[in-house]
């Protein structure tokens, strides 16, 4: 049977496509990450030791948890991505515990290292 309204193909993207609140801070952070992915990432090359890559991880962390928490999670992920750091599959946690406060950003280091054990 002919369908006059064909379904649109789902667009492939490398970034998080789930639901998230579109606040000004998140939009600014995601815009900066996307700018990096489009411009600078091509010059640096695919050298990330993790899956998803550090920019994809930071994009998803900001989308899910906001600019402050997501940026700290991404920062610590980039620190761990060095030659003597971690590697492998490390997803963004779906929720943060109550012990993670905005005034203790060093606590976000512990979030990501739990996934590698």
Swiss-Prot record:
What GO cellular-component annotations does this UniProt entry give? plasma membrane
* UniProt key word Manganese: no
Q: Does the keyword Cell membrane apply?
A: yes
Q: Name one Pfam family in it.
A: YidD
Where is this protein found? Cell inner membrane
Topology in membrane: Peripheral membrane protein
The alphabetical list of record keywords is: Cell inner membrane, Cell membrane, Membrane
Top-level taxon in the UniProt lineage: Bacteria
Location (main, coarse): membrane
Role: Could be involved in insertion of integral membrane proteins into the membrane.
Q: Cross-referenced NCBIfam families, in alphabetical order?
A: membrane protein insertion efficiency factor YidD
Indicate the family of this protein. Answer: Belongs to the UPF0161 family.
Identification of the protein by name: Putative membrane protein insertion efficiency factor
- Origin organism lineage: Bacteria, Pseudomonadati, Pseudomonadota, Alphaproteobacteria, Hyphomicrobiales
């Amino acid at each position: 049977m002919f369908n006059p309204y064909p379904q649109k193909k789902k667009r492939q993207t490398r970034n998080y496509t789930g639901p998230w609140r579109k606040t000004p801070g998140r939009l600014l952070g995601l815009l900066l990450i996307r700018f990096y992915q489009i411009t600078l990432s091509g010059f640096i090359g695919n050298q990330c030791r993790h899956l998803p890559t550090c920019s994809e991880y930071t994009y998803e962390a900001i989308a899910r948890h906001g600019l402050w928490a997501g940026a700290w999670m991404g920062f610590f992920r980039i620190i761990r991505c060095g030659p003597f750091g971690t590697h492998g599959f490390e997803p963004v946690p779906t929720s943060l515990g109550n012990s993670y406060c905005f005034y203790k950003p060093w606590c976000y280091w512990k979030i990501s290292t739990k996934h590698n054990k």
